[in-house]
Amino acid sequence: MKLFEVLSPPKPLRADAASYVPDAFRRATTKHKGNLGYLGRGAFAQVYSHKNRPASAFKVGIGDGDNTYLKYIERASQNERWKSNPYLPRVHSQKNYKDPGGGASYVVEIEKLEPFMDLEQEEVEAIIDRAFHSLPKDKYSDLPRQYDVVEALQRAAAGYSDAIKNIKDKKLLQALAIIGNIGKSLYSVGKKTGPYARENARMHLDIHTSNVMIRRTSVGAQLVITDPLV
């Protein structure tokens, strides 16, 4: 994959775009090695900065249209109303690749965000005040408040009524509804019956402290749910 192909000015998303490039994943991470800065990794992707695009991050991953991350960013960018939701990531471009051997990979250019865990606790409390009616701290826990936030987000996305009712920010409710609906559609939970249908959907939610990040704004730190599904 030629990483420079996504370093041109951002274009509208084309989820069906595919180019047959041998060794796509390997080439993506070596073509611009001198300009890339490693930011982090997950099970199937790595994230890089590029010195010529300081406001962007580039996620290079293995997978095709069935990849849960690609499904998420495509849905999040599907219409103007969702694109304006501050809790969803801002996606600048996406390119999908397949090589002759059948392997698939992708490069997604997204806004560069800050780690949620780097916030001071006062900033986390400000986020809690804006987003939730209440979120008491467990007096027996020494964990940072970020863990309370992600647990509340995970439970709301999973459809627990008490967690949903505790959210006062309508934009956050919208974002979590999008995430929950994608999880259901990906795993066909809506077509299943029986006692484990809802639990199957919940199993595929993956909202944790590494998959929630921060966008700096004029009114403070804004939560962004970056990669909530497995």
Residues covered by each model-derived region:
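Conserved structural core of kinase catalytic domains
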Residues: 84-178
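Short, solvent-exposed loop/turn segments that connect beta-strands within catalytic domains
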Residues: 53-54, 83-84, 99-104, 216-222
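Short acidic, low-complexity intrinsically disordered linear motifs used
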Residues: 1-8
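Protein kinase-like catalytic core scaffold
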Residues: 56, 87, 106-108, 203, ...
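ATP-binding glycine-rich loop module of kinase domains
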Residues: 35-37, 41-94
